[in-house]
Regions:
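Radical SAM/AdoMet-radical enzyme domain recognition
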Residues: 51-73, 81-182
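Radical SAM enzyme [4Fe-4S]-AdoMet core and its adjacent flexible, acidic
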Residues: 122, 126-264, 269, 274
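Glycine-rich phosphate-binding "P-loop"
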Residues: 40-46, 72, 76, 127
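Short pre-active-site segment immediately N-terminal to redox-active cysteine/selenocysteine motifs
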Residues: 24-28, 36
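Short, hydrophobic/glycine-enriched beta-strand segments
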Residues: 15-21, 72-73
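N-terminal active-site segment of His-dependent metallophosphoesterases
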Residues: 33-57
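Flexible mid-to-C-terminal extensions adjoining Fe-S/redox cofactors in radical SAM and related proteins
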Residues: 1-15, 35, 39, 268-321
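Catalytic nucleophile-elbow at a beta strand-turn-alpha helix junction centered on a G-D-S/GDSL motif
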Residues: 23, 76-79
């Protein structure tokens, strides 16, 4: 197994804002913490304040010389947030080079994506076997796969229905012309302090350890130059970061590493802003503050286990390098 040495920006430093817009989801998966779907923080209204403060965040990075920007929306299910489309539309109009990404369960009807696909560069389509309407997922994936720069078909590996998920992944292979297929192991409770799920069946564990990220393109799709990307430096070479690969190899342990958490601000469902989602970075107020200000600085990680894909890809390296 290759040894991870460090994670760096592909070119220049880039700023990424990950926004868990609310905690309402139309799915209530058994492996997901209720904090992700309870629905008590809908965060509707305040659109202009959200726009103003989001622009203030990115303008702060611009003033520091940053040229590359990404915003990644999650939830809950962000497509059910009433501010979602108006906010994304504004950002696309006012930050022309921004990469807009969304993590969605792809449950919206096809018409939704026909109307709004042009707003998105990256779509991470999580498959949740307990609630997903499989035919709708396939229909939407087939439509989107040649409309956006990157479509990830992300299979959440439910323990009891593991092989049903594998079977659906095979259906994606057969029916979706362009796909980026990820087999994603679960985390216990899927919360800030979550540990990796223990798959007791060694066959399942072996499947995950040997599963490869699969990228297939059979038909033409848009290509967009994107510099808001991190690179993983291994003792065997350099490649784009794949957080699943790092997790499967049990190399997502960065205690003592210098991590650029404030290049990757996180907004939780209550609106609190912090460096990354792990709880190690400092807090910077709330997205609804009328006088939002913040300072940006890295941290030396004191947490044993880095569990979130958006945190794993943040540029970081051991302090003795």
């Amino acid at each position: 197994v290759s040894t991870l040495l460090k994670i760096t920006p592909m070119a220049e430093p880039y700023a990424c804002l990950t926004w868990q817009v609310n905690n309402f989801c139309n799915f209530q998966c058994s492996y997901c913490n209720p904090g992700n779907w309870a629905g008590d923080n809908r965060n509707n209204g305040n659109l202009q304040l959200y726009i103003d403060n989001t622009m203030k965040i990115f303008n702060t990075y611009k003033q520091r010389g940053y040229k590359h920007f990404k915003i990644f929306f999650s939830g809950g299910e962000p497509t059910h947030w009433e501010n979602f489309i108006p906010l994304v539309t504004y950002l696309k109009e006012h930050i022309p080079n921004i990469t807009v990404a969304v993590n969605t369960n792809l449950s919206r009807p096809l018409k939704y994506w026909q109307e709004h696909y042009h707003l998105f560069d990256d779509i991470v389509a999580s498959f949740h076997v307990e609630f997903c309407k499989k035919d709708r997922y396939i229909e939407n994936a087939k439509f989107l796969c040649d409309k956006v720069d990157y479509l990830c078909t992300k299979m959440l590996m439910h323990d009891e229905r593991f092989w049903e998920v594998v079977e659906f992944g095979e259906r994606v292979r057969q029916e979706v012309p362009n796909y980026n297929l990820e087999w994603t192991p679960l985390f216990d409770e899927m919360s800030v302090n979550a540990g990796p799920w223990k798959y007791k069946d060694p066959v399942k564990q072996s499947f995950l350890e040997n599963a490869q990220f699969e990228s297939v393109q059979r038909i033409d799709k848009p290509y967009r130059e994107n510099y808001a990307v991190s690179m993983a430096h291994y003792d065997t070479g350099v490649e784009p970061v794949n957080s699943n690969k790092i997790i499967a190899a049990r190399q997502n342990f960065f205690t003592g590493w210098k991590c650029q958490v404030d290049d990757a601000l996180f907004i939780n469902p209550r609106g609190d802003i912090s460096g990354a989602s792990c709880g190690v970075g400092q807090t910077h107020g709330n997205i609804t503050d009328t006088d939002l200000t913040f300072d940006l600085k890295p941290v030396i990680c004191n947490k044993q286990h880095c569990h979130c894909g958006t945190d794993i890809i943040i540029p970081k390296e051991p302090v003795n390098v």
